[in-house]
Amino acid sequence: MPIKPLVILPDPILREISKPVEHIDSTIQQLADDMLETMYNAGGIGLAAIQVGIPLRMLVVDVSIFTSIFEPDAPQDPIIVINPEILWLSDERNICMEGCLSIPGYSAEVERPKRLCIRYRNREGEQKEIEADNILATCLQHEIDHLNGCLFIDHLSKVKRNMVIRKFEKRAKENNLEKEIL
């Protein structure tokens, strides 16, 4: 399974809205496997297809490193999520420290709904629903945001968000990458 290169801020593809997966076939299944391998290699707990440059409504998560200790009733296997639809979000809120493989080296506290329910297709194309809370709910919301062109820094104050964007634009310029205003 090849490890895919990660798309890093300020790459404008991160702001694209991903398109639905039309057919779940061996190509999509291989992409899911590659995304998991890429996520594990980078030390992440979630990855959206857009973060490897593929604008499809698809993501992978594996929060077992946390849940095995703190939430043993939560899913302990990786979850492949295709064409997710949020069915509901709780009114109760939770603040979690979030980071992102596309914004390396930066993390911040983000407030989100504590629980949610999503409907999605799995790797085999079967329709599933999952109710999640705590770290899994946060991770799913974070990755679904990516599918809609939203980054976790968009949940921060304008001052903090602009500071992060400027830092990564400067880094991109120093690395002779194309500068793009988000």
UniProtKB/Swiss-Prot annotation:
Any one GO biological process: translation
Entry keyword Hydrolase: yes
UniProt KW keywords: Hydrolase, Iron, Metal-binding, Protein biosynthesis
Catalytic activity: N-terminal N-formyl-L-methionyl-[peptide] + H2O = N-terminal L-methionyl-[peptide] + formate
Gene3D superfamilies noted in UniProt: Peptide deformylase (3.90.45.10)
One Pfam family it belongs to: Pep_deformylase
Source species, domain of life: Bacteria
Cofactor needs: Fe(2+)
Binding site for Fe cation: 100, 142, 146
InterPro entries: Peptide_deformylase, Peptide_deformylase_sf
The EC number(s) this enzyme carries: 3.5.1.88
Note describing how the cofactor binds: Binds 1 Fe(2+) ion.
A GO term, aspect molecular function: peptide deformylase activity
Transmembrane spans: none
Entry annotation: catalytic residues: 143
HAMAP family linked to this entry: Pep_deformylase
Family, per entry: Belongs to the polypeptide deformylase family.
PANTHER family: PEPTIDE DEFORMYLASE (PTHR10458:SF22)
Function: Removes the formyl group from the N-terminal Met of newly synthesized proteins. Requires at least a dipeptide for an efficient rate of reaction. N-terminal L-methionine is a prerequisite for activity but the enzyme has broad specificity at other positions.
Protein name as annotated: Peptide deformylase
Origin species: Bartonella bacilliformis (strain ATCC 35685 / KC583 / Herrer 020/F12,63)
Gene: def
